[in-house]
Amino acid sequence: MLKYTWPLLIFGIVGILNQVLDKILFPFLYPGADMREQLGIYGACVKIAMIMAMITQAFRYAYEPFVFAGGKGEKSKESQALVMKYFVMFTLLAFMVVVCYMDVFRYIIRRDYWEGLRAVPIVMMAEILMGVYFNLSFWYKLTAKTYWGAIMSAIGCGVLVLVNVLLVPKIGYMACAWGGLAGYGTCVLLSYFIGQRHYRVPYPVPAILGWFALALALYFLRATPPDTLSTFHFPLFTFDCLWLRLAYNTLLFAVFAAALLWSERALVRRVMGKLLHRLPKNK
């Protein structure tokens, strides 16, 4: 029992470190005199990205008992693959809501902190990858090889620290966002390739990568205010008119939502049929 659980303890501790370590390291790495101000900007903007963290956390509590109840059969593997696809689709839909309507969400924080909004999409994408990593993590739990979880999480944490050490002196709090993305991305890659050797699950990788590609393409096409710094400091479309920005970004969101509905039209048709069947009929 101890052999199974102690790596999970390390896994949990490292997971907490991945969430807070960048903020702990920042004061020691940032060379500017405005360190507290910069850290405050980053911390405030991360609050918006916590929308994604709440989604992934709720998913974790609901999904883990379902997987362990299903065991290690082929049907369970197919269910895990299907859930992974829908998890990515739903979280990317939430990502599109936030980035397309940042003009609305930015009022959650003070106007003085708006310059840090360019970190929000990166932090949100890191949270999505954290959820993907959680989905991938069941292979070592079901095969009683939990030490892999501790090893991979430690490597991911090391990548986060390395990115922060190298980039915080150069690009400030943006390095914290990129460090989280790099750390979780490393964990995802390690868990997928190692896991497929020990516990093969037929994840629809091309479809998942396609949804990421579509979401990122629409993200780069979104409209921003003229005075807003984008993630890469060169927004493609800047409109002065708020309503024009919202209308244009709504169109981009509609493209993504329509693509989701079209790809899952058979499922949507079945769900709508069941809902309509439950409606009271006029006599």
Residue ranges and their predicted role:
Residues 1-4, 8, 26-50, 114-117:
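Interfacial/gating helices of multi-pass transporter permease domains
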Residues 11, 15, 57-60, 100, ...:
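Short runs within selected transmembrane alpha-helices of multi-pass transporters and secretion channels
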Residues 26-32, 104-114, 226-241:
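Membrane-interface helix termini and inter-helical loops of multi-pass transporters
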Residues 61, 135-138, 181-228, 255-271:
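C-terminal transmembrane helix end/exit motif
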